[in-house]
């Protein structure tokens, strides 16, 4: 007897049934590897399997050699026969089969034909009931009712279009082709991969959609947890291609803000395709924590609200990545019905929309009109890297709805970061390309590029009116012949920021403006335009060279500052300036503060404007109190009073109203604007080398009296003086002071007392400031045109005091007195002749002398 061989104990090696599950050969499906790397991995893995197999054969040969050489052949035969008779051999076979089933069972094992004719529903049901992973091989497997998926189901096919599961023509209404078993409370742990679901909607006739609720979709997942759907194709769907929803056959409508019970959650949909659907390709309702990536939804059967991807009522925390849509109403529609909560907290990371009507459509129906309640749930959408190609409505979706690249309605908290819209046929979209409308709020559009929409009215339009959008930021936009109005803002939009807009409009049909706003308070900066006749139109005013507008607190070129009001500014300043009230500002100053509205400090230090309408310029340590007070080049001074101004001064304090003051450590001069008075502490000088004091008098005959004639009074008016008459003065052109001109209005415009003094009344301003002003004469008509006395021929400047040029005859001598004949001075006893400047000329009939009139 030979020695019993030392047999080697082999460890079990990995599952290798690549024909069933890619998970048994994971490297072949590792998308990070190149094709060559995948093939090398597979060859290496198979070589390892071959080594193990060869070793098994060698060890088995050792056993057989031992049996034969030691005469154990008969004993082995007897043992095998006994096992067979006792049933142990059958048990071994069954055990092996059961172990093989762990790798998966084929529906054909349970009688499925896959011939496109035979009803294979029972084979599917038995295979699924076995509890083992189920494999659907090549073929078309007809079913007479929907396939139910219990928890812990694994269903894998030979690939899209290779393994096809299809409704038979005899199937009635209300059936979904595949759905989880417990439609109310749901199931868990379902894995679906690599087959086609054909709803065979043609069996129902043309134009047929779902009968209601979530019924009649190709794949319905209701109230399920942990579902993985990969490489599934849904075609010819009565309702949806793939529908992820909550428990129940009917979608719940519990009101805005009310979440439905039993949501589906932790759902993964990858590399799937939907086409020929009656409603939506891939859709979600009342579910959460969903990922949809690398899917394609296209070409629906019908023309209603047929969306490629629809994130609908009550969906939340959904991420869509790198998907594609074509020929649908909405490429991606994120929405809700009026009596359901809106989808919220949705993220879109890359999408390509080709020839959809509205590539990206975000809305909460029933919350758009001014009389509708504001949506409480339509919030938080972030979408990046969106592509829209040739949006159009050639098929007439939704009663010929107008195409859009993007439409946002009723949502708030929407962020678009990277959106490109392109068309090569400008006639496909002629209204608005991108719209924020119907009470949408707090939306941000950044990085938008539109090209080719040359017949469109608006590139980007924030629609105004009673149900318009608001709080919109539009930035970094490039418009290439897209929109007669590049960016347009409607009426009533209170909060909008428009920055860095670049537009070319030389290929547009009648371009108007790159940016247009109805209201006057937008924030605008960084506009660049070619081909638009107007760069910016704001509240009806055109700006052809660009425009920059800022709202809110503003600080620039300032190292530090205190509080700045939302309607205040600080520029070019240092050391803790504050503009803490509305409509106030500080320029190129330090340690200064505005504490009342409509106040300004510029070029100053340690100054404060505490009253409204105050101004401080070029001053140090200046304070302006009350209203309309100001200091200009006035340091260590305080202007207290209404309409009080200090100029070029140091160390003075002023009170009162409607005054202009100046001085050094004390007030030295004052202009009283209210009463027209001038005060000075020292000398007031004139500009002429000889000056006189004069008043206006009216001529008796209304005619002009020429310069240099002596005049007398006659009936309160003047005429040329004659010999022996009282001379009151001379017609003068050298007066340093002239009274009685009535320069600005009729001398009777205000009431006067019997002594000619002005009658005053006390008035109080809206801000409570009291002051006196002249009482208007009720007979005065301010609408009548007034001509001052200086422009009327009958009024003359009569020098009454001073050194005045007088017409003389040949009798007048220097140092002697004068009298008058016909207004010409002759020898006499009045006044004194200072000097004769022009000797008497017989031809002219007079000379000229300077006479001291007093």
Curated annotation (Swiss-Prot):
The record marks 691-692 as: Cleavage. The active site is at residue 695. Autocleaved to produce the 74 kDa gp12* assembly attached to the phage particles. Autocleavage of the C-terminus is a posttrimerization event that is followed by an ATP-dependent release. Keywords: ATP-binding, Degradation of host cell envelope components during virus entry, Host-virus interaction, Late protein, Magnesium, Metal-binding, Nucleotide-binding, Repeat, Viral attachment to host adhesion receptor, Viral attachment to host cell, Viral tail fiber protein, Viral tail protein, Virion, Virus entry into host cell. Mg(2+) binds at residues 285, 310, 312. GO terms for biological process: adhesion receptor-mediated virion attachment to host cell; symbiont entry into host cell via disruption of host cell envelope. GO terms for cellular component: virus tail, fiber. It is found in: Virion. Its main location: virion. SMART domains: PbH1. Its cofactor is Mg(2+). Structural component of the 12 appendages that hang from the lower collar. Adhesion protein that binds to the host cell surface during virus attachment and mediates teichoic acids degradation. This is Preneck appendage protein. It comes from Bacillus phage PZA (Bacteriophage PZA). The lineage of its organism: Viruses, Duplodnaviria, Heunggongvirae, Uroviricota, Caudoviricetes. The gene is 12.
